[in-house]
UniProtKB/Swiss-Prot annotation:
Domain of life of the native organism: Bacteria
PANTHER family for this protein: UPF0102 PROTEIN YRAN (PTHR34039:SF1)
Record-stated family: Belongs to the UPF0102 family.
Protein's name in the database: UPF0102 protein RPB_0420
Annotated organism of origin: Rhodopseudomonas palustris (strain HaA2)
Disulfide bonds: none
GO molecular function per UniProt: nucleic acid binding
Record-linked NCBIfam families: PRK12497.1-3, PRK12497.1-5, YraN family protein
Amino acid sequence: MAKTKHPPAPDRVAAFQTGISAETRAAAYLMAKGYRILARRFKTPCGEIDIVAQRRQLIAFVEVKARARLDDAAYAVTPRQQQRIIAAAEAWLMANPDHATFELRFDAVLVAPKRLPQHLPAAFDASP
C-alpha cells in the first residue's frame, strides 16, 4: 500500500520561506562586500552549508541565521551544528578539489527584520 504524502505544516512552510529569504539577503550582502557565491544550500548526508562564498584566495562556508533579533541569532549555531557544517565543508572540498589550497573559514551571517545583515567572519573554527 502506498503511503499518502501529507502537506507540510504551515509553521514548517513559514520557517522554510524565512530561511530562503534570509539566505537570499545574506548572499546579496556578501556579494556587495566583494564575495562571489559558489554554492547555496549545499547538501550532504552529514550536513548542509547555507552559502559557500569566495573572496580572492579565501573560501567562506557561511551559516545563515534568521531571528527576530540579531542578539538571538548570534547564539543559534550550536556545537553540533558546527560539526555538521564542518563535515559538509569537507565534502564540498572533496567535490571541488581546485579550491583545496585556498584559505578556509567558517562564517555566520545574522539576519533580522528591518536590519542590515551582520557578517561574523570566523564565527567558529574547525579545530577540535
